[in-house]
């Protein structure tokens, strides 16, 4: 029997933080995901949150995110992505 998990959400965390940029790095034992923002006309991204997790949890997150995107697209249509952008373009998302 699966146990119910009670999730506590701090009010400040519940407000959320907007991110239009992220960067992923890893070592043999962990994945690091930085979430940040790039503002028009500014050359730098500001990191607002860093999540560090195990490779196993990173893969479970990937699977959960993929399923959630599939559900979203089945209800709202395909999410369109811009064409290929160079890593230093400064807008959108980046994988390392």
Feature roles, as predicted:
Residues 1-96:
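Positively charged, low-complexity terminal tracts
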């Amino acid at each position: 029997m699966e146990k119910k998990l009670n999730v506590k959400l701090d009010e400040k965390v519940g407000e959320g933080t907007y991110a239009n940029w992220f960067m992923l790095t890893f070592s043999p034992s962990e994945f690091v995901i930085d979430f940040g923002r790039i503002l028009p006309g500014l050359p730098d991204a500001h990191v607002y949150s860093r999540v560090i997790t195990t490779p196993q949890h990173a893969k479970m997150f990937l699977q959960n995110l993929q399923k959630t995107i599939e559900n979203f697209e089945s209800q709202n249509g395909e999410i369109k992505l811009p064409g290929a952008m160079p890593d230093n373009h400064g807008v959108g998302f980046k994988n390392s």
